[in-house]
Swiss-Prot record:
Transmembrane segments: none annotated. This is Deleted in azoospermia-like. The lineage of its organism: Eukaryota, Metazoa, Chordata, Craniata, Vertebrata. Residues 1-25 are annotated as: Disordered. Residues 167-190 form the DAZ domain. It comes from Macaca fascicularis.
Amino acid sequence: MSAANPETPNSTISREASTQSSSAAASQGYVLPEGKIMPNTVFVGGIDVRMDETEIRSFFARYGSVKEVKIITDRTGVSKGYGFVSFFNDVDVQKIVESQINFHGKKLKLGPAIRKQNLCAYHVQPRPLVFNHPPPPQFQNVWTNPNTETYMQPPTTMNPITQYVQAYPTYPNSPVQVITGYQLPVYNYQMPPQWPVGEQRSYVVPPAYSAVNYHCNEVDPGAEVVPNECSVHEATPPSGNGPQKKSVDRSIQTVVSCLFNPENRLRNTVVTQDDYFKDKRVHHFRRSRAMLKSV
């Protein structure tokens, strides 16, 4: 006893319609794509840009009650030249496809409407835009020296080629270490606090003494001094601006006349620095008698 699976009338009609549509499409010179044939729907190609859905609906109304007319357009709304016409009731799609239809003097390309299978929808997830912000300014303390602080600042964006790094010392009385830019040698500038803030800057140089030997003999007042060997230390004038500034040209041999009192005259003795300045305050130098002929 064999069991037979009876076929429904709808499946038989659908298979026959598909076969007829395939043969009709092959007779018109094009091959149908693989997919599911949409019932009661006709593919219409060769649509002129001047045609609208209302005209197409009124034209295909002769074949049955038109359900929908869809003209495919691009993103700008311009027709791509083809569309679909669907009917409410069962219509003879094969009869419509085999008919030669000219609309506005242009032959329409008709065929069964086929929905393609295995359609892959490609969804691309948009990537978020990431903006690289410049790093925030960094302030670091160098503990190698308790009075030394390091200040770092990122380069400004005003000029993309040249980068400037500026240091901001907050303590003017403390040494400041300046770091200049990226991948550059580090220069340490040590500024010792020699004066408080707001005070006039002055440089104090300790006086230096050089030994000068003079030859002096006993002379009467008013006579020229004959040099005799004696050791006198001459003070070098300070480099700062003072009320009394004297310069000594060491390239010229200078002999200083010494006029001593008879009570304090010394013979062939060494005159110390204190005695020299004491005698200098007592006796006045006279340039007319002080300059001697150099030997």
